[in-house]
Amino acid sequence: PTARVTLTPKYDTICDGDNIGVTLTSPSTPTRQVRFRYTVEKPASVTVTPAGPENNLTPGTVLTNQIDNPTDSAQLVRFIVTPYTRNPGDDGEKCTGTNDTVYVWVEPTAAVSVSPGNDTICDGDNVAILLSSPTESTRQVRFRYTHIPVAGVTVTPGAGNNLAPGYTITDQI
């Protein structure tokens, strides 16, 4: 039969510096066990370790490549996996099967930019700190903050959660 590959998961989103976890299996049953090889397609700025190509991988192999995305945008990395049958008596490729692709979005490390409206305020005044981010991820960046208590200073409310870019912190001090 023509060798086929099953990839689990086929689509994934990971954080910068994380490892993938893709299992290679095959429903095909040739006379000798199917083997797999893969190549990687990635943007130039992204690093994949190991970078591939790799071959002679057995069914049940889990790809655990680490992917580093130093940019401020989500990047798509593709792993093209090809199954094949082997020559009798060695592990050389005999018949190439039907390849399939794993699609991995690699999120950037989120960054925050804060812009205070004033650098000096009076007791009882409100701050005006604008939150923004250069990060372009697959989903909108969100922020949370807390203040570090200082003796004799009260900050109200002093914390925030699930804040979108463009939000202005207006705590009273």
Task: Label every model-predicted segment.
Residues 1-173:
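Extracellular low-complexity Ser/Thr/Asn/Gly-rich intrinsically disordered segments
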